């Protein structure tokens, strides 16, 4: 097996280069070029590489070359181990390590984009991301059954993303966790930790709940049912009184104790720091949402860490957004659950925090439903965990599932893949597109927000999670308001249709569906073009329900190019997209494979 350092560096080049090619439109795919063959005859193994990438960096008069293992119709390609560069017209070439390749690419962007960029910050994040991938790979390389097994639990899947977002330039960059604490808080290292508790007088508490009990009652009840909590603690703190108990992530608790306003509350006697207690909760893929299979609820915390592009903070409007999403399902909009019984939401129906004027206090805690309680945790996996690249020498989890089913059913992997994909679209894509066209409600359904429950290897239930992930179309405002008064206004989730179209297309189609299709293709299970045709057919079936002024369907089915989130440029300009209105990431025009590949097949 390759060394963890080699694996991490190759994964880093691959994700960064795929972002660069997509977002800048650079790169040539060369299959027959004698001059290049002459240069690389002794460098590339001709029997394993029939396609080269040639990427010209004109501003520096440099050309990068790499071997292409798999060229993808959805534009996430697989590259070989070796990269080389050529200066000007010289016939000599030099081998390039990952730092050299990425330095060249960042320098080219710096020259082309000029002011307003932050190349040093980007380079730092790339290196740290690579170092984290190396650590995760080294620690988990023998843990293949949990990473890629036919059967896994919810938390095993959540903790399986060793490489992270496959089309992000810094998928595992984290700023704010000390290295020696990484194992405790990182899902990739099976992190788990006790929660730290604060006791707050009701005069400074802000809580809401759409459940039968208040948030305070729910949290105290969880502690009373925890065998790891002492009777003395329960007797002292878990009674019905004028105080609330707030669980806080350990990193956030440490940060809060250094804040002057928190120290003032403690001095005034309205706040008490109790410390850690109870069972250890496990880190999910988002780091800040913690889970335990014996807890009725997951807990989503503010978290003083910058992950990929953004600080992870529960904003006040997001607390309300969780309740709004839960309330929405009790209106006519909730008919989507009856019409598509394989589709469901993981809601955030309660929250608690401390009042600190009009801004966040840092005590924001979101109560999230936990459908993966006890034995229900079996075979529930986020989509990103199915298609995550495997450690060299292993298959992805999706590949292992399809191969096992093919063996059991005496069918080809292609036949099983096609059936699996069709079943999956029935419980995920179809209900979300229907809800969007019918009610103007879009979900930020990317791979990490999408959890699928499997039965005998096949998808039977889809769950959407994320209280930050609702968009409501302005054109449907009157209808939505009739269902739920003031929907989207307090939470800031109402947008013009063209904005919602763009976001919905990226998250549901580019990130989620194209990402899943790419996972089938890169694993050699089925040609991506076949699944793209299936996807297009399903989208076409919704044309009779098309809703103006939305152009969601028309552009997907007709436009050669579409707006796609540019993770590299967003990172390059150091944009914190979660702190900006309209989720102000940078979007660029990219090729639409639903048009391009269908045209090629025709």
Swiss-Prot record:
Keywords of the record: ATP-binding, Ligase, Nucleotide-binding
GO biological process terms held by the UniProt record: siderophore biosynthetic process
InterPro entries per UniProt: Aerobactin_biosyn_IucA/IucC_N, IucA/IucC-like_C, LucA/IucC-like
Pathway this chain belongs to: Siderophore biosynthesis; petrobactin biosynthesis
Catalytic function, reaction form: spermidine + citrate + ATP = N(8)-citryl-spermidine + AMP + diphosphate + H(+)
GO molecular function, one term: acid-amino acid ligase activity
E.C. code: 6.3.2.-
Top EC category: ligase
Binding site for ATP: 286-288, 300, 312
Coiled coil: none
Mutant phenotype after disruption: Deletion of the gene leads to a decrease in siderophore production during iron-depleted growth and attenuates growth. The deletion mutant cannot produce petrobactin on iron-depleted medium. Mutant produces the petrobactin precursor 3,4-dihydroxybenzoyl (3,4-DHB) and bacillibactin. The deletion mutant is severely attenuated for growth in macrophages and virulence in mice. In vitro analysis show that mutants grow to a very limited extent as vegetative cells in iron-depleted medium but are not able to outgrow from spores under the same culture conditions.
Summary of the function given for this chain in its UniProt record: Involved in the biosynthesis of petrobactin, a catecholate siderophore that functions in both iron acquisition and virulence. Catalyzes the ATP-dependent condensation of citric acid and spermidine to form N(8)-citryl-spermidine. It can also catalyze the condensation of several di- and triamine analogs of spermidine with citric acid and the condensation of the citric acid analog tricarballylic acid with spermidine. Required for growth in iron-depleted medium and for full virulence in a mouse model of infection.
Family: Belongs to the IucA/IucC family.
PANTHER family referenced in this protein's UniProt entry, alphabetically: L-2,3-DIAMINOPROPANOATE--CITRATE LIGASE
Protein name (Swiss-Prot/TrEMBL): Spermidine-citrate ligase
Gene source species: Bacillus anthracis
Lineage: Bacteria, Bacillati, Bacillota, Bacilli, Bacillales
């Amino acid at each position: 097996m390759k060394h963890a350092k080699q694996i991490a560096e190759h994964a880093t080049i691959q994700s960064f280069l795929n972002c660069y090619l997509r977002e800048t439109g650079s790169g040539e795919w060369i299959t027959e070029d004698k001059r290049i063959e002459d240069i690389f005859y002794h460098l590339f193994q001709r029997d394993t590489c029939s396609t080269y990438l040639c990427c010209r960096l004109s501003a520096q008069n440099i050309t990068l070359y790499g071997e292409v293992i798999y060229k993808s119709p959805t534009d996430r390609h697989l590259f070989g181990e070796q990269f080389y560069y050529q200066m000007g017209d010289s016939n000599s070439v030099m081998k390039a390590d990952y730092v050299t390749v990425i330095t060249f690419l960042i320098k080219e962007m710096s020259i082309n984009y000029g002011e307003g960029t932050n190349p040093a910050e980007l380079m730092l994040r790339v290196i740290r991301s690579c170092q984290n991938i190396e650590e995760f790979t080294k620690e988990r390389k023998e843990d293949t059954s949990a990473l890629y097994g036919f059967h896994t639990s919810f938390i095993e899947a959540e903790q399986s993303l060793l490489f992270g977002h496959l089309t992000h330039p810094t998928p595992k960059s984290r700023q704010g966790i000390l290295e020696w604490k990484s194992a405790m808080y990182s899902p990739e290292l099976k992190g788990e930790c006790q929660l730290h508790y604060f006791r707050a007088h009701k005069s400074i508490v802000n809580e809401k709940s759409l459940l039968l009990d208040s948030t305070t009652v729910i949290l105290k009840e969880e502690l009373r049912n925890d065998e790891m909590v002492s009777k003395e603690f329960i007797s002292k703190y878990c009674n019905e009184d004028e105080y609330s108990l707030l669980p806080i992530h350990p990193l956030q608790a440490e940060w809060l104790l250094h804040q002057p306003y928190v120290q003032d509350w403690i001095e005034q006697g309205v706040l008490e720091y109790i410390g850690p207690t109870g069972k250890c909760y496990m880190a999910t893929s988002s780091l800040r949402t913690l889970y335990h299979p014996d807890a009725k609820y997951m807990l989503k915390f503010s978290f003083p860490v910058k992950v990929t592009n953004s600080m992870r903070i529960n904003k006040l409007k997001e607390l309300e957004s969780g309740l709004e999403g839960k309330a929405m399902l009790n209106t006519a909009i909730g008919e989507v659950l009856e019409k598509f019984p394989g589709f469901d939401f993981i809601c955030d129906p309660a929250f608690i925090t401390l009042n600190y004027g009009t801004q966040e206090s840092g005590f924001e805690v979101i109560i999230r439903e936990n459908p993966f309680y006890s034995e229900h945790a079996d075979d529930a996996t986020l989509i990103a965990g199915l298609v995550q690249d495997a450690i060299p020498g292993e298959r992805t989890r999706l590949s292992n599932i399809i191969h096992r089913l093919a063996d059991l059913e005496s069918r080809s992997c292609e036949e099983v893949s096609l059936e699996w994909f069709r079943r999956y679209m029935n419980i995920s894509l179809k209900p979300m597109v229907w809800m969007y066209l019918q009610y103007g409600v879009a979900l930020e359904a990317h791979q990490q927000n999408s959890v699928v429950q499997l039965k005998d290897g096949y998808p039977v239930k889809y769950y959407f999670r994320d209280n930050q992930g609702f968009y409501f179309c302005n054109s449907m405002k009157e209808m939505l308001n009739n269902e739920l008064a003031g929907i989207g206004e307090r939470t800031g989730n109402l947008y013009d249709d063209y904005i919602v179209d763009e976001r919905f297309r990226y998250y549901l189609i580019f990130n989620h569906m194209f990402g899943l299709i790419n996972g089938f293709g890169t694993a050699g299970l089925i040609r991506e073009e076949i699944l793209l045709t299936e996807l297009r057919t399903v989208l076409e079936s919704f044309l009779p329900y098309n809703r103006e002024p939305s152009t969601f369907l028309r552009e997907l089915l007709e436009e050669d190019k579409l707006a796609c989130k540019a993770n590299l440029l967003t990172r390059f300009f150091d944009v914190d997209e979660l702190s900006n209105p309209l989720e102000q990431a940078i979007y660029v025009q990219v090729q639409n494979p639903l048009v391009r590949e269908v045209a090629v097949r025709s």
